[in-house]
Structures are given as structure tokens and as C-alpha cells.
Curated annotation (Swiss-Prot):
CDD domains: CYCLIN_CCND2_rpt2 (cd20577). This is G1/S-specific cyclin-D2. It comes from Mus musculus (Mouse). One of its GO terms (biological process) is positive regulation of cell population proliferation. Disulfide bonds: none annotated. Keywords: Cell cycle, Cell division, Cyclin, Cytoplasm, Membrane, Nucleus, Phosphoprotein, Ubl conjugation.
Length: 289
């Protein structure tokens, strides 16, 4: 008799606690969220060696690592929060940027994952340009500069608070959530969103997700303007600011899709058997505008 071990243990999750979705929790998140934002636009006043395109490159690499390791959705935005806060206070040579990104993923996965990423695995993703001991030493450096304040508020903390207040059918919420999570990951790769309050990014992402799905009449129960006003009311956000944020998110998605299609076109001669490389955030190709 042949025995096959095909069982895959599902991720064990706690039962949703309604107490964590009460208005007082949302208000507390709104009160403290700006404590964890970068204090300045560090490319102008702190970093002399690192340019915005370098941040975008390391962010894309970090996102691909998180996707391949099937990390929780919160890990990547949280890691980018650590990276931006560190760079806002510490001049860093560009040769250490990938090391910093690996350390930030290491810390974020410890906070959000049941089984966190290991130092050895992260070093493999750097093509062994970083050694495990070096990563562990830098872990202490980053922790010290962040003053051990790791429980940062991210856009994901607001998603469930927002969704439960929307007049949407429950069976549609999972699709809206999935698209909103994609937008949040996309925003984390672009520095212009680094100093936006997480609540605004979350609200804009949900709004962009629903408006992008408006071809489905069952999803679109409100006009986009009415939806924006409702979302702004939920998170106490200025309507005009929210509209501007949502437009920037949609423009970022469009640019990402165009870039992906261009890369596909350039790789037209590539063998069909070659694996598809992650060049765009999770499920971006499935999002409609």
C-alpha cells in the first residue's frame, strides 16, 4: 500500500471578534496613525545616495519575496513603513538598501506571521549578497532607530472597519477586499503615498476597488460621488482630499498595467515554458478601471 502525504495544514485564524470592530477602536486608530509616518520627505533632506527609483526597485523586490513566501497581506506594507521611517532619520548608502529591505521584512514577518521568515531564507533572496549575521546585526540597528515602535498602523487596519459600514452584499465583500489589498500593496511601492495617513490610503483603495467593479450592478449600489462621501464620513477624511487620493491610486494602477503590458510585449519572444515573473503587485491584472 502506498501512502501519500498530501495534507496541507490551513492557516489557523482566530474567530473574528466584533469588539475589535467597534467605533472606539476605529477612533483610536485614527488618533495614533500619524505617529508612525515618516517625519520628512527624506530624499530632499536626509538621503544623499538613495534616489526614488532605488526605493521603488527594492520595494518591488520586497513585494515579490512576500508574494512568493505567501506572507500575510500586512507584512509588505508594514515592512515598507519600517524602511521609510528608518530612511527618514538615518543617511544610508545605496549599497545597504537591499539589506535594509530584508531586515524590514524580517521584522514585519515576526510581528504578523505565525511562522516568520528566517534570516537564512531572506539572504538567499539577496543572492547571498547579505550574510545572516549581518542581517541580525542590522536588525538591532533598525530596532534601535525605530525605538522598538513596530506595531505601526497600516491601511490594512482600517479595511474591515470600512467594509462593515458599506451597503454591500456580504458575498461581494471578499472581492472588494482583495482589490483593495492590491491597491494598498501598489501604494506601498510608490513613495508619494509614504506620508499619506493609512486611513486615507485604505479609504481611497476601497473606493477605487468599488468604482473599478462598477460594471457589476450588484457591487455598485452607490454612485462614485455618494460612495466617496460615505467613505470620507467613516474615516473623518476631507472629501476633496479623498477624491484626489483615489484618483492618484487609479492613475498608479493604470501606469502599472501599462508597464506590465509593455514588459509582456518586450518578452514576446520568450519561451512559453519559462515561468512568469512577478513584475506587478498581486492580482493587478485582474483589477478593472
Amino acid at each position: 500500500m502506498e501512502l501519500l502525504c498530501c495534507e496541507v495544514d490551513p492557516v489557523r485564524r482566530a474567530v473574528p471578534d466584533r469588539n475589535l470592530l467597534e467605533d472606539r477602536v476605529l477612533q483610536n486608530l485614527l488618533t495614533i496613525e500619524e505617529r508612525y509616518l515618516p517625519q520628512c520627505s527624506y530624499f530632499k533632506c536626509v538621503q544623499k545616495d538613495i534616489q526614488p527609483y532605488m526605493r521603488r526597485m527594492v520595494a518591488t523586490w520586497m513585494l515579490e519575496v512576500c508574494e512568493e513566501q505567501k506572507c500575510e497581506e500586512e507584512v509588505f506594507p508594514l515592512a515598507m513603513n519600517y524602511l521609510d521611517r528608518f530612511l527618514a532619520g538615518v543617511p544610508t548608502p545605496k549599497t545597504h538598501l537591499q539589506l535594509l529591505g530584508a531586515v524590514c521584512m524580517f521584522l514585519a514577518s515576526k510581528l504578523k506571521e505565525t511562522i516568520p521568515l528566517t534570516a537564512e531564507k531572506l539572504c538567499i533572496y539577496t543572492d547571498n549578497s547579505v550574510k545572516p549575521q549581518e542581517l541580525l546585526e542590522w536588525e538591532l540597528v533598525v530596532l534601535g532607530k525605530l525605538k522598538w515602535n513596530l506595531a505601526a498602523v497600516t491601511p490594512h487596519d482600517f479595511i474591515e472597519h470600512i467594509l462593515r459600514k458599506l451597503p454591500q452584499q456580504k458575498e461581494k465583500l471578499s472581492l472588494i477586499r482583495k482589490h483593495a489589498q492590491t491597491f494598498i500593496a501598489l501604494c506601498a511601492t510608490d513613495f508619494k503615498f509614504a506620508m499619506y495617513p493609512p486611513s486615507m490610503i485604505a479609504t481611497g483603495s476601497v473606493g477605487a476597488a468599488i468604482c473599478g467593479l462598477q460594471q457589476d450592478d450588484e457591487v455598485n449600489t452607490l454612485t462614485c460621488d455618494a460612495l466617496t462621501e460615505l467613505l470620507a464620513k467613516i474615516t473623518h477624511t476631507d472629501v476633496d482630499c479623498l477624491k484626489a487620493c483615489q484618483e492618484q491610486i487609479e492613475a498608479l494602477l493604470l501606469n502599472s498595467l501599462q508597464q506590465f503590458r509593455q514588459e509582456q510585449h518586450n518578452a514576446g519572444s520568450k519561451s512559453v515554458e519559462d515561468p512568469d515573473q512577478a513584475t506587478t503587485p498581486t492580482d493587478v491584472r485582474d483589477v478593472d478601471l
